[in-house]
């Protein structure tokens, strides 16, 4: 599963790494 930058809950459901998804979300969200 890839991190969805459009969904804030993506970082919670990302098994690859919460930090990675969180960063992706933060970048997508100014």
Curated annotation (Swiss-Prot):
Expressed by the venom gland. Keywords: Cardiotoxin, Cytolysis, Disulfide bond, Membrane, Secreted, Target cell membrane, Target membrane, Toxin. One of its GO terms (biological process) is killing of cells of another organism. It comes from the Eukaryota. It is found in: Secreted; Target cell membrane. GO terms for cellular component: extracellular region; membrane; other organism cell membrane. One of its GO terms (molecular function) is toxin activity. Disulfide bonds join 3-21. Belongs to the three-finger toxin family. Short-chain subfamily. Type IA cytotoxin sub-subfamily. Shows cytolytic activity on many different cells by forming pore in lipid membranes. In vivo, increases heart rate or kills the animal by cardiac arrest. In addition, it binds to heparin with high affinity, interacts with Kv channel-interacting protein 1 (KCNIP1) in a calcium-independent manner, and binds to integrin alpha-V/beta-3 (ITGAV/ITGB3) with moderate affinity. Monomer in solution; Homodimer and oligomer in the presence of negatively charged lipids forming a pore with a size ranging between 20 and 30 Angstroms. This is Cytotoxin 3a.
